[in-house]
Amino acid sequence: MPRAPRCRAVRALLRGRYREVLPLATFLRRLGPPGRLLVRRGDPAAFRALVAQCLVCVPWGARPPPAAPCFRQVSCLKELVARVVQRLCERGARNVLAFGFALLDGARGGPPVAFTTSVRSYLPNTVTETLRGSGAWGLLLRRVGDDVLTHLLARCALYLLVAPSCAYQVCGPPLYDLCAPASLPLPAPGLPGLPGLPGLGAGAGASADLRPTRQAQNSGARRRRGSPGSGVPLAKRPRRSVASEPERGAHRSFPRAQQPPVSEAPAVTPAVAASPAASWEGGPPGTRPTTPAWHPYPGPQGVPHDPAHPETKRFLYCSGGRERLRPSFLLSALPPTLSGARKLVETIFLGSAPQKPGAARRMRRLPARYWRMRPLFQELLGNHARCPYRALLRTHCPLRAMAAKEGSGNQAHRGVGICPLERPVAAPQEQTDSTRLVQLLRQHSSPWQVYAFLRACLCWLVPTGLWGSRHNQRRFLRNVKKFISLGKHAKLSLQELTWKMKVRDCTWLHGNPGACCVPAAEHRRREEILARFLVLVDGHIYVVKLLRSFFYVTETTFQKNRLFFYRKSVWSQLQSIGIRQLFNSVHLRELSEAEVRRHREARPALLTSRLRFLPKPSGLRPIVNMDYIMGARTFHRDKKVQHLTSQLKTLFSVLNYERARRPSLLGASMLGMDDIHRAWRTFVLRIRAQNPAPQLYFVKVDVTGAYDALPQDRLVEVIANVIRPQESTYCVRHYAVVQRTARGHVRKAFKRHVSTFADLQPYMRQFVERLQETSLLRDAVVIEQSSSLNEAGSSLFHLFLRLVHNHVVRIGGKSYIQCQGVPQGSILSTLLCSLCYGDMERRLFPGIEQDGVLLRLVDDFLLVTPHLTQAQAFLRTLVKGVPEYGCRANLQKTAVNFPVEDGALGSAAPLQLPAHCLFPWCGLLLDTRTLEVSCDYSSYAHTSIRASLTFSQGAKPGRNMRRKLLAVLRLKCCALFLDLQVNGIHTVYMNVYKIFLLQAYRFHACVLQLPFNQPVRKNPSFFLRVIADTASCCYSLLKARNAGLSLGAKGASGLFPSEAARWLCLHAFLLKLAHHSGTYRCLLGALQAAKAHLSRQLPRGTLAALEAAADPSLTADFKTILD
C-alpha cells in the first residue's frame, strides 16, 4: 500500500478539533473481526491510495459505531450516498456531503435527486459527485458494507490528504464551524533564545507573563489565606450552578457551564474556565483568559445580546443634527417610580425587554436580591429626569469661538464657563464655504472635554449607593476616560472595566444582607451582577447613548484611527457644506417619488449607498457605505444584501481572473509594493547596464477626482472588452481554507476561484494540487462550499450595468442617481479605475516604457524617462486633460524634476524639484540619480502612533502586543527598501535603522496601552525579548529579500552581518526609550551593555557606516511624532 502524505500540520489541526483522528484502516480494524483485510493483493492503485490518504475524525459527542456491524453490501454506492444526503437534509445538519442539496418545498419544486424522495440539488457539489461515481469508494463499500460506510459519512468527518501538505474535507460538519474543546488548550511554542542581548537566554526571556503589580498581589493575599495562585478550597457539597441559587424563580440571566474551581479575588473578575497550569500574559491579578461567564441572551432591542466588551464602533457616525436624547432611550422611556425601577432592573440584569405602554404584561415574581435594588434604581431614574444635559454640554464642551469670549484658552480646555444661548458662530456672507469649512473643522471637542461632560452626567445620574464607595466611582470614571480615548477599532475588555472594583462595598449586590460569611459561589455571583451593570452603563445603555445623542464621532484622513468628537450642531453645518461641494464635483440627478418607488420594487434588489464625510485637514472626503438595500431598513446582515454582495464579489473575482490572464489590461497599474518592486528593479538594472547612465526625468501626476470623474459610457466599453459577455462562461468555486498558525491559533479564510472550461479542475484533489502549485497554500484544509459551472458573462455584465447606471445615493432624506463616475465604497472601485486608466494608457501612451518606466498606483502616475520631450508631452497631456476618460491632473499634487517653461501649461505650474533630489511618490522617496529607494516618513509628522496602532489586548495582552509588533514589522520590511541590487549598502542601513526607529515608537505606544497599569520593571525580560525578536525578525526578512547573497560571516564580517542589524535595533530603541527613562530605566542598562558588546564585535568600517546611517539629521521626521 502506498505511503500516506505526512501532512503533520494538518493532522495536528484535526487532532485539536476532534476526539479521535485515525487512518481509515485503523478505524475499520477496530470494528471488524481479527484478520479481516481491507486492502488485498491485486486491488487497484486508486483504492490503495484512498485507504492510505483517508483520515477518519470522530467528533466530540458523536454517536458510537454499531456494536456488531454487518459488513454486507445491500445498496449501490449512489443509492447509499443519496440516502445519507436525504437524512442529513431532514435533520437539518450542516454537513459538507450535503452542501448544495435541500428539501423540496412548494415554492421550489422540480424532480428530486435520484434515489431520494424529497431532495433537490440547487448547486453542484463536486466532492459528493466524485464520491458517488468513484470506483475506489465503490470497492470500499463492498469491503465494509452499508452500515459502516453510512456511519462514516453521516456521523464522522472524512478528510483526504493531498501531497505535499494539505487535505480536503469529504463529509462531516465543516471544519471552520468547529471550536477547540476547552479541555484541550492549544500549545504555544516558547520564544527561542536570541544571542546579542545579555541575560536573554531561553530561560530568561521565554516567559511573557506580565506579572501583576505588588499592590494587587497584596490585596489578593488579604482576600484569602491560601496561596495566591491556588484555587478555591473544595466545598463539602457539590457546588451549585448559578442558575440554582435562591433566585431561581427568575429567568436565568447568567447561565454557567460546569467549570473547574477558579480562584477568588477582591477585584471583580469574570468567572471563567481555566486550567490551573495554564499561564497567560499580561492579565490582571486574579483573572482568567477566557470568555465571560454569561452567555448571549435574547434581550431587548436597546440592549445588545453580548455585553462582553464596550467598543468604540458603537458610537461612530451617528447621524442626526439635534443634540438631544431620543424618546426611545431606555432611561427616558421609564418613569421614576418603583415600577419603572423594576422594569429597569429586569432589563439590565434579567434580559427582559421593556413593554410598550398599554401592552398586556404578565407580572412575574422578582427575586429578593433584585427586589431590594428598586429604590436605588428609582433614584437613578429620578436623577436622569432632572439632569440638565444641555447645560452640562454647553458648560464642558463649549463651541470654541464662544468659549474664547468668556474665558482663557485653558478654561475652554478644562470645560469651564457656561454659554446659555449657544449657537455655532455664523460666518459672514462674504466668506466662502472653504474658509468656513476650515473654521468648523477646528471646532471639535477634545477627549478631555468629552470626558468632563460624561463625568458630570454620571455624577449627577448614579446614586452614591450604586457606586458603593468613592474608590469604585473613581475606578469607573477612569475607565470611561480611557474608553473615549481609544482608537477606531479598539475595545475595552471586561477585565479592564471591572479591575479593582470592590464588590464588598456594594451592599445592593448582597443576596442575604445579614450573612457574615460569603461563599465563593455567592461572591462570583455578585461579581457577575456588578460586571453586567458596569458593562451596560459604560458600553451599551448610558455612556454610548450620550455620545450618540450629542456628538458625531469619526476618524480623519490625517490622524489615522484617532477619534474626533464634533458636537452635532457643528457637524450638521459641516455636512451641509460637504453636500454642496459634492454636488459641485459629482453629477447627481434627484429621483422623483415614482422613480424611488420603482427602485424599491425592482427585482433583483438594488443597493443604495449611505453617504458620510471624513474630515481632511482642509476639507471633507465623501465616503459611501453600500450595505443597504433600496427601500429596506436593513444592514449588511440582511439576506438580500448578502446575496447582492455575494454577486458583487463574484464579479470582482471574474475581473481579477481576466486581469491575471491578460496583464496588459491594467497597463502600468501597480497592485501593491511587490508589483512596484518588480517593475522598479527591472528598470534599475536596465538603466545601470547602460554606460554612461543617462539623465532621467521624473514626472508625478495625481488625478483630480478619479472615481467621480470616470465617464460611465467609456467604463462600460472597457468592461465589455474585459468580460466579453456574449462569449465568456465562467466556473466559480467557493471554498474555505483553514490553517493553524505557529502560535496554535486557527485562521479561516473564505475564497472564490474563477476559471473557464479550458482550465477547470473539476475534482477537488486536482484543485488542491493546483492551489499548492500556483499559490502559497501550505498546511491547510480546503472545504468546498459550492461550485457554479455556468456563470454566464452576460449576467455578470448585466450586474455591472446595474451597479454603474443605477447607483442610488441617499443624501439628507432624498435619493439621487450617480450619472458620472463609480461608487467609492464598492470593492470594485479601485479595479474599475485601474482598468479604465489602463485602456487610456494603451491608447495615448504606446511605447512610453521603451526606455523608461511608467508606474501608476490607482490614480497616481509616475513616469521616469531619459527623454525630456517625452516627459514634457506626458505632463502636457495630463494637465490639459483627457475628457474621454475623465482624467485631469491636479497641479497642486504634480511634481517634476526639470524646468517647465512659463505658460507652457497655462496659468499654473507644477512643483519643480531639483534635477538631483529625493523624488516623492506614494510614500516613497526615489533618488533621481542613483535610483535608490527609501521610505517617506513625513506622513507620520504631528500624528500619534497610539491612535494608529491598536492591538487586541484580550486575555494575553503581552503576547498580543508582541504578535502585533512583529506583524506590523513584516509589513514595513518591504523588498523595495531592503533589496541590495536596487539600493546601496548605506541606503539599506539607513532604511533598516528607520524601520527600527519607527518600531521603537510603536513599542512605546503599545506599552502605554497595556492594561492593568503593568509596569515594565515587573517583567523586563519579556520586553527585552520583544526587542531582540524585532532584530531577529527584521534580519530574517532582509535575508529573504536578498536570497542568493551572502550577507554575513563569522566574526561579524560580511556585507550586512546579523550583528549590524542588532546594533541598529538597539541604537534605535535606546534613542526612543531614553526619552522616557522613568518608564524604561530597567531596560536601558541591558540595552546599553548589549550595544557596547556588539560595538566591540563589529569591524571599525562597518561600525562607522552604521553610525553614519543613524545620524540624527537623517531622522528629523521622527521628532514631530506626538508619542
UniProtKB/Swiss-Prot annotation:
Where is region (CP motif) located?
A: 381-401
- GO BP term (any one): telomere maintenance via telomerase
According to the UniProt record, where is the region RNA-interacting domain 1?
1-230
Q: Name one Pfam family in it.
A: TERT_C
Give me the ranges of the annotated region Primer grip sequence. Answer: 921-925
| Residues carrying Phosphotyrosine | Y697
Q: Where are the residues of the annotated region RNA-interacting domain 2? A: 309-539
Q: Where in the chain is the site Required for nucleotide incorporation and primer extension rate?
A: V858
User: What are the GO cellular component annotations?
Assistant: chromosome, telomeric region; cytoplasm; nucleolus; PML body; telomerase catalytic core complex; telomerase holoenzyme complex
Where found?
Answer: Nucleus, Nucleolus; Nucleus, Nucleoplasm; Nucleus; Chromosome, Telomere
**Where along the sequence does the record put site: Required for optimal binding of telomeric ssDNA and incorporation of nucleotides at the second position of the template?**
Q169
Residue numbers spanned by region GQ motif: 58-197
Q: Give the free-text PTM comment from the record.
A: Phosphorylation at Tyr-697 under oxidative stress leads to translocation of TERT to the cytoplasm and reduces its antiapoptotic activity. Dephosphorylated by SHP2/PTPN11 leading to nuclear retention. Phosphorylation at Ser-227 by the AKT pathway promotes nuclear location. Phosphorylation at the G2/M phase at Ser-446 by DYRK2 promotes ubiquitination by the EDVP complex and degradation.
Region (Linker) spans which residues?
231-308
Q: Where is this motif: TFLY?
A: 312-317
Task: Please explain the role this protein plays, according to its UniProt record.
Answer: Telomerase is a ribonucleoprotein enzyme essential for the replication of chromosome termini in most eukaryotes. Active in progenitor and cancer cells. Inactive, or very low activity, in normal somatic cells. Catalytic component of the teleromerase holoenzyme complex whose main activity is the elongation of telomeres by acting as a reverse transcriptase that adds simple sequence repeats to chromosome ends by copying a template sequence within the RNA component of the enzyme.
The entry sums up its family as follows: Belongs to the reverse transcriptase family. Telomerase subfamily.
What's written under domain? Answer: The primer grip sequence in the RT domain is required for telomerase activity and for stable association with short telomeric primers. The RNA-interacting domain 1 (RD1)/N-terminal extension (NTE) is required for interaction with the pseudoknot-template domain of each of TERC dimers. It contains anchor sites that bind primer nucleotides upstream of the RNA-DNA hybrid and is thus an essential determinant of repeat addition processivity.
Protein's name according to its UniProt entry: Telomerase reverse transcriptase
From which source organism is this entry? Canis lupus familiaris
- Lineage per the UniProt record: Eukaryota, Metazoa, Chordata, Craniata, Vertebrata
> What gene is this protein translated from?
TERT
